[in-house]
Amino acid sequence: MALTPTNLNNEMSLPMKMDCQEQELTEKNNSFFQKLNVTKSVMQDLLKEIIKVDYILDRSDDEDDISSENPQTDFLHKGMLELEAKHDQDLGKQDEQETDVDEYPQASTSLQFSKKNLLEFLLKDMLTLKGQIDKLEDRGLDLDQGTNTEVNARNEVYELKKKVMESLEDLCKNVELLSAKLRMYQMEGENTDSHSSEETDMEEMETLLPQAPASFLVQNSPPPNTVWKCALRIFIMFYVLTVTGLLCYILFFGATFLFERVLLRMLGCRTTWDLREMIEPFLNSEVEALLPS
């Protein structure tokens, strides 16, 4: 049987819908990665600003006094190095996550919304930290001021460094959670793809199978007349067999069993005796009496 236009349209619409969904997901992923690159650049600028402020503070002190009396700058150098190392690790994890998402563009959109919210939160934190650093630079730290202002500036920078470290740690945790969710969504997407492929195959097979004509179905289904005829034949055969069986029993064994037990239970005593009185002349008559004279 030839395919109808509706079946052809359904078959053509399935791959077109899949292509449109893939394009939408790739566009959303591209926008997400653009925002991610913006956050990377903001973080790099923030690190540069922190290093610049640290350099200004270190230059204001004498080298001997810094090594002997103020060990906070050494700790600050170590913290900045740790910060840069963690930043590099975060960038590596984000690049790996980017490659994973490019390989599987059919991940769920809910994961992308959570990533966008996280990036917006981090951008706000970065902008606030950068604003505080700009305020420190605008103050114009003078080299002739006392040690109290320098200690306060160092404490502020140290607090800023703590905030940046905490935000980076939160970023690492969130990236790990998002990667785990991404893997889970990838597994679910593979399962749904397998089920959808099976369903589409079944639908295609159903559309391709020719429909049986109505005349063929009518021929296979038996007409009601034949059903009634079969039932009537069975009833007649059963009736004939029962009557012949009773007649054979009466002929060879006698009618006492029928009149004393069977009919007595079915009809009652009075009707049974009346029936016997009606049939008694025929039972006692001889064959010669029935013959014509």
Curated annotation (Swiss-Prot):
Tagged with keyword Transmembrane: yes
Residue spans crossing the bilayer: 234-254
Keywords for the protein's UniProt record, in alphabetical order: Coiled coil, Membrane, Transmembrane, Transmembrane helix
Membrane topology: Single-pass membrane protein
Regions annotated as coiled coil: 116-188
InterPro entries: SMCO2/5
GO cellular component, one term: membrane
Subcellular location: Membrane
Main location per the UniProt record: membrane
Record flagged with keyword Lipoprotein: no
Protein's recorded name: Single-pass membrane and coiled-coil domain-containing protein 2
Organism in which the protein naturally occurs: Macaca fascicularis
Taxonomic lineage from the root: Eukaryota, Metazoa, Chordata, Craniata, Vertebrata
